């Protein structure tokens, strides 16, 4: 959590040019391009190495910072989709539909480089914890509104919030018949349908 706080503080200190460079790096990763060193990236972006080090102290931290920014943008899209709905259960369904895209083809290109980075775990854990908290709050509201059965909302939130990351792991990925996103959506629908009350 300390690492995530440092990332947030760092993002507040970045200037307009730094943010533009991060957009360029995001575009590079989106296109599947890579860079071996900070110096290599500086050449590709046609900037000074010093400017790059103002954003992050290492290649590893730069990738983590960029992916953190991408996930926050995606989180905002999920929250906007949720807020467009009226009832807690509809909000939950909309939120999860977008949240599961985090393990879809596009965002997987960003998260895949994190697999071998030790410093990425805290950042990924932070985002998963945030998603789980949103899910639990919506489940609690849905239970109060009698839209779902009287369930253990914490356990259900942990399950729904961790599906994508679970199926994205190399250990399980090779055995899936569908993509992690499709599998997560399939199981999410089964779980939600199983806890809904008839009047919802």
Predicted feature descriptions by range:
Residues 1-8, 94, 133-144, 162, ...:
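C-terminal peripheral helix-coil segments that are non-catalytic and often amphipathic
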Residues 2, 20, 24, 28-61, ...:
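Helix-turn-helix
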Residues 13-25, 41, 66-70, 74, ...:
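Generic hydrophobic, amphipathic alpha-helix propensity
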Residues 14, 63, 67, 71, ...:
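Amphipathic, non-transmembrane alpha-helical scaffold segments
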Residues 65, 78-105, 157-160:
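Hydrophobic alpha-helical connector segments
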Residues 81, 107-114, 167, 171-174:
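Secondary-structure edge/capping motif, primarily at the C-terminal ends of alpha-helices
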Residues 89-113, 125-129, 197-200:
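Helical hydrophobic small-molecule/effector-binding pocket
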Residues 119-145, 154-158, 166-169:
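Amphipathic alpha-helical packing segments from all-alpha helical-bundle domains
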């Amino acid at each position: 959590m300390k690492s995530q706080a440092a990332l947030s503080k760092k993002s507040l200190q970045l200037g307009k040019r730094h943010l533009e460079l991060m957009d360029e790096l995001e575009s590079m990763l989106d296109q599947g391009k890579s860079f071996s060193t900070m110096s290599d990236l500086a050449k590709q972006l046609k900037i000074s190495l010093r400017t790059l080090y103002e954003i992050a102290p290492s290649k590893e931290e730069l990738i983590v910072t960029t992916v953190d920014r991408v996930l926050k943008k995606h989180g905002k899209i999920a929250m906007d989709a949720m807020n467009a709905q009226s009832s807690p259960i509809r909000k939950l369904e909309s939120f999860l539909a977008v949240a599961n895209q985090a393990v879809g083809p596009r965002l997987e290109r960003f998260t895949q480089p994190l697999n071998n980075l030790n410093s990425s775990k805290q950042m990924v854990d932070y985002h998963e914890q945030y998603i789980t908290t949103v899910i639990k709050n919506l489940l609690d509201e849905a239970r109060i509104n009698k839209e779902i059965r009287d369930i253990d909302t914490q356990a259900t939130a942990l399950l729904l919030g961790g599906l994508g990351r679970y199926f994205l792991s190399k250990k399980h990925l090779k055995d899936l018949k569908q993509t992690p996103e499709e599998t997560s959506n399939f199981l999410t629908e089964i779980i939600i349908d199983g806890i809904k009350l008839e009047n919802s």
